[in-house]
Amino acid sequence: MPRLEQRFDYVKVSLASPERIIQWGQRTLPNGQVVGEVTKPETINYRTLKPEMDGLFCERIFGPAKDWECHCGKYKRVRHRGIVCERCGVEVTESRVRRHRMGYIKLAAPVTHVWYLKGIPSYMAILLDMPLRDVEQIVYFNSYVVLDPGNHPGLSYKQLLSEDQWQDIEEEIYREDSELEGVEVGIGAEAIQRLLRDLDLQAEADQLRQEILNSKGQKRAKLIKRLRVIDNFIATGAKPEWMVLTVIPVIPPDLRPMVQLDGGRFATSDLNDLYRRVINRNNRLARLQEILAPEIIVRNEKRMLQEAVDALIDNGRRGRTVVGANNRPLKSLSDIIEGKQGRFRQNLLGKRVDYSGRSVIVVGPKLQMHQCGLPREMAIELFQPFVIHRLIRQQIVNNIKAAKRMIQRNDPQIWDVLEEVIEGHPVLLNRAPTLHRLGIQAFEPILVEGRAIQLHPLVCPAFNADFDGDQMAVHVPLSIEAQAEARMLMLASNNILSPATGKPIITPSQDMVLGCYYLTAENPKLPDYSDRYYANFQDVVMAYEQGHLPLHAFVWVRYDGEVDDGDTSEPQITTYEDGSRLLEYALRRVKEDANGQRISQYIRTTPGRIIYNQTIQEALAS
């Protein structure tokens, strides 16, 4: 099979038309035979263990089960590549085509798509401008709906009728002297399909815009919601009636495999059971329609087909959940793609990527805000290509093999080269779940011992991280553009404000707040140290470090700078014989000469507050 490579910018998910679904699965063989429709519920033959033709694992539709071998065995080996066997109709190709070739089931009666009926909000109910309960009553054959009131005076468009009401109207229509004409009533998904087909989206949108101008409150909000849905349908070119399915795609068989266990039994994907229910009910309905069975029996079979398709698309969304062995609910298509273990989050978004690592985070109190501590063991693995390149460029080694051996030996030269490599090379840190853009930020790595990533405590609120065992992923931006982008846009020190609220997201919390409080707190129960005077801040800190002073003890320390303590009270004044004065305030003592010039000033503080203030001043100065 040729390797297909195609560049694309985005993936668009939209409604598929019945023609598009058939196009996915239909192929024309060289003999003119059209294949693709799955008509039988069988999977594999219990005697030959080969897939049944036109069944859920059919080789004619999905491709051969074995590489380069047709179903009947007439053609084997790669030399027959591309030949379609005239006996069994199977194309001789690789078996991996069974991973992407699709089939389809043509339904004997339309059914609604449960996502659009029972989703929140219900797009079907919004488009039809009907309550969801009424739409459900129609879909599940509990009520009739008026498709065309004709000239009946008591009927209106989209009016719901019970069985008895419809029978009375029917009798009235078929009376010999009846003048009623053009009355049309429907039930089930066919009626919903007709109502959706009758919608003129452009006219509805224009009318809604007029109504919105003249309405307010709850009614206006409802009209805007409906207009938004209609505008989306117009913009995407999707037709509302496509929400009612007439064809169901059958996903490739290798994505819903059937494998033989040791005891001879088979394990199969739940999807096969759900598809089998749909095919059985669809075939039975087609047979009942052929033999012109009574309407009540046909209607019941249509309802059962609707429920089977609902279970296939989203088991348990409406009605009873379909269960398999051991009363375990069967996994439907929705269950496979939704949630943490689903296809998107587990296999597409959650892929393992190269140049990435993962480890537990611990607090790094000595780091600057734009730095993170990266374990040496992790750094040498992540930056290995860069290290090897530099080793060869500096002619320390001659080739890649020698460089790798040097790394494996933990040669001391390696760490010097690694230091050079990581200098100025930012790394990205990500903590799942990444709920906003600050869930991934860039940091300058600092090599640390141990096996844990060190993180600055200030960036924790942005990541919603704490240090009780949280893990974070590290990614290395490779290209110059990626590195520049990481440095300019994603560096932690450039993301101080929350993009959502505009308020600071880098705020001190937990240990930092507690530390600041502890340093600046008072302790009135301590012995009185207020008779101690110190010449400067350094003397106070030295006395504390030598154990002569507690952290929270009040002392007097000389400070000749300006003090703004907000104290407006009158000081207690003591005048000396030489004319000098001592002015005693609550938190400072000022000595002046006879001319009122200040000689000295002492302020009342604690060693803790001095340490706190010095730390702040040093940080501001740097």
Swiss-Prot record:
Its EC number is 2.7.7.6. Disulfide bonds: none annotated. Mg(2+) binds at residues 466, 468, 470. It comes from the Bacteria. SUPFAM superfamilies: beta and beta-prime subunits of DNA dependent RNA-polymerase (SSF64484). Pfam families: RNA_pol_Rpb1_1, RNA_pol_Rpb1_2, RNA_pol_Rpb1_3. This is DNA-directed RNA polymerase subunit gamma. Its cofactor is Mg(2+); Zn(2+). NCBIfam families: PRK02625.1, rpoC1_cyan. It comes from Thermosynechococcus vestitus (strain NIES-2133 / IAM M-273 / BP-1).
